[in-house]
């Protein structure tokens, strides 16, 4: 849907803020890619330098919204509010959620209380931090949640209410700068399962990958069939991050895996898809696994 049509569908927005729209790209969010992320981050940073712009709302498909939000959380260089919003139901549905979500997103972006909160996601009445937001359900309107930390706040009757802030580094505190980047390092995800074979991972060692995210079982544990491949990856200079396919809880350092011995990185609270985002940006700064572990601890 064109941005103009979205704004026309919710005329009440004009009572909250002076809103102008710009179409950056028109794709399904399942087709999101690094180039769009770089374009979006650069455009947002350019716009937020203007004194007449107080905040930005990004309409986005829900499939990869959590990844885009987290990428922007690490690359936007402003304390002005940046809010992502989408819809789980089509506009033709009996109870479409898009119009109210968009209204609440504009309310959130316009509120002075939203300043310096990091990039936000406004969905189904909740205000969520980009670092902790996860899509938890394939179809439900309450799909976006923060299972490890809870929502930052909520919107009710056109007003925002915040209950907490994130302690993770973001936006103006972030060391990552995409201003002069035209591409991101190649990082892939390996999903673990019982009886996984080495040939699922081996091709990544010779196809230009700079990093591998291992979506392990339990606390990021690694099957014996692919452990040698991942240690070989480290010998070749490919970074390896242990995350987990389990939806909640951290992947902790040196639990059942001796991370220091193998020079693996533990993803902490980040799920595999967000771990990929952080590792790509981390690799633009360094290949030192200890420094990258520090990034995962802080961001």
Q: What kind of region is each of these model predictions?
A:
Residues 58-80, 222-231:
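Short Gly/Thr/Asp-enriched flexible loops that form oxyanion-binding sites at enzyme active sites
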Residues 1-2, 64, 70-83, 98-104, ...:
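A glycine- and small-aliphatic-rich helix-loop capping segment at beta-alpha/alpha-beta transitions
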Residues 219-299:
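C-terminal non-catalytic interaction/assembly regions of soluble proteins
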Residues 84-157:
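Internal gly/pro-rich beta-alpha loop/helix module
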Residues 1-10, 110, 122, 239:
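N-terminal phosphate-binding or glycine-rich loops at protein starts, especially the Walker A/P-loop
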Residues 1-47, 228:
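ATP/NTP phosphate-donor binding region
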Residues 50-65, 207-219:
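Short acidic, glycine-rich surface-loop motifs adjacent to enzyme active sites
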Residues 2-13, 129-211, 219, 298-299:
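Accessory alpha-helical/coil subdomains and C-terminal extensions
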């Amino acid at each position: 849907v064109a941005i103009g049509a979205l704004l026309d569908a919710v005329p009440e927005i004009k009572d909250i803020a002076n809103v102008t729209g710009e179409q950056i790209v028109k794709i399904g969010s399942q087709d999101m890619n690094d180039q769009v992320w770089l374009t979006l981050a650069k455009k947002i940073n350019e716009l937020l330098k203007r004194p007449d712009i107080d905040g930005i709302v990004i309409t986005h498909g829900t499939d990869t919204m959590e990844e885009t939000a987290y990428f922007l959380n690490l690359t936007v260089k402003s304390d002005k509010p940046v809010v992502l919003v989408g819809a789980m139901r089509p506009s033709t549905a009996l109870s479409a959620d898009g119009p109210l979500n968009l209204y609440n997103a504009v309310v959130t972006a316009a509120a002075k209380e939203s300043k310096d909160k990091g990039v936000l996601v406004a969905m189904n009445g909740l205000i969520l931090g980009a670092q902790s937001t996860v899509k938890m359900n394939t179809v439900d309107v309450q799909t976006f949640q923060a299972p490890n930390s809870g929502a930052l706040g909520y919107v009710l009757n056109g007003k925002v209410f915040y209950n907490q802030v994130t302690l993770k580094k973001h936006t103006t505190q972030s060391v990552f700068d995409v201003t002069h980047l035209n591409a991101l390092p190649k990082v892939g995800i390996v999903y673990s399962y019982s009886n996984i074979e080495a040939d699922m991972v081996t091709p990544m060692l010779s196809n230009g990958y700079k990093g591998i995210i291992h979506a392990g079982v339990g606390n990021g544990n690694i099957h014996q069939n692919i452990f040698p491949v991942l240690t070989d990856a480290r010998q070749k200079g490919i970074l390896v991050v242990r995350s987990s396919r389990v939806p909640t809880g951290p992947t902790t350092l040196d639990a059942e895996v001796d991370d220091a011995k193998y020079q693996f990185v533990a993803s902490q609270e980040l799920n595999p898809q967000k771990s990929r985002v952080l590792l790509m940006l981390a690799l633009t700064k360094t290949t030192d696994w200890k420094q990258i572990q520090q990034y995962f601890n802080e961001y």
